[in-house]
């Protein structure tokens, strides 16, 4: 539902980049894309410790507040349904969802907000919306930090493709650990 709503919002944008039917997707490769993709192992090596510390600190905050620590339902849904369903969910989580979410959140929402709110404001607002729309209190802070990193990667590379790679790795690790 949330992706459909944001896709409709993004599709309603009236401005179009020259030569691009849907500029909000921003899926065109950029000149520095190879450099950005080559740096992904370093980005991942830096990200996972930051994510781990954020997740641990957030769990402590939630525990101190007496809040439940539950996994996202989407991670639990396929676990008892057999290998074909698990494989299908894994394909969606690693192959499809990162492309759609990065096109919507970094390619459309962040870029659109950046024009009016500047980079910092757009980064925080789009990251907060991204985290909220995952509908899970236990993962709110870690997903917010992930989204901030994805904005940094997007700004550094000028493309959503490195963000898609990082997002796919993140989803793959989470799906595997669930």
What is each model feature region?
Residues 100-125, 155-159:
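Membrane-interface helix/loop boundary segments of multi-pass membrane proteins
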């Amino acid at each position: 539902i949330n992706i459909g709503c944001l896709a409709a919002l993004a599709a309603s944008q009236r401005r179009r980049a020259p030569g691009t039917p849907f500029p909000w997707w921003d899926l065109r490769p950029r000149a520095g894309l190879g450099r950005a993709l080559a740096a992904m192992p370093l980005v991942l090596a830096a990200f996972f410790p930051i994510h781990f510390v954020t997740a641990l600190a957030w769990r402590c905050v939630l525990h101190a507040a007496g809040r439940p620590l539950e996994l996202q339902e989407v991670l639990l849904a396929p676990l008892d349904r057999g290998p074909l369903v698990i494989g299908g969910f894994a394909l969606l989580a690693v192959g499809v969802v990162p492309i759609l979410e990065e096109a919507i959140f970094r390619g459309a929402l962040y870029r659109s907000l950046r024009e009016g709110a500047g980079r910092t404001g757009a980064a925080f607002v789009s990251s907060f919306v991204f985290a909220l729309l995952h509908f899970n209190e236990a993962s709110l802070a870690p997903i917010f930090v992930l989204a901030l990193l994805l904005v940094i990667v997007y700004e550094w590379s000028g493309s959503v493709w490195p963000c898609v790679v990082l997002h796919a790795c993140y989803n793959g690790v989470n799906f595997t650990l669930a």
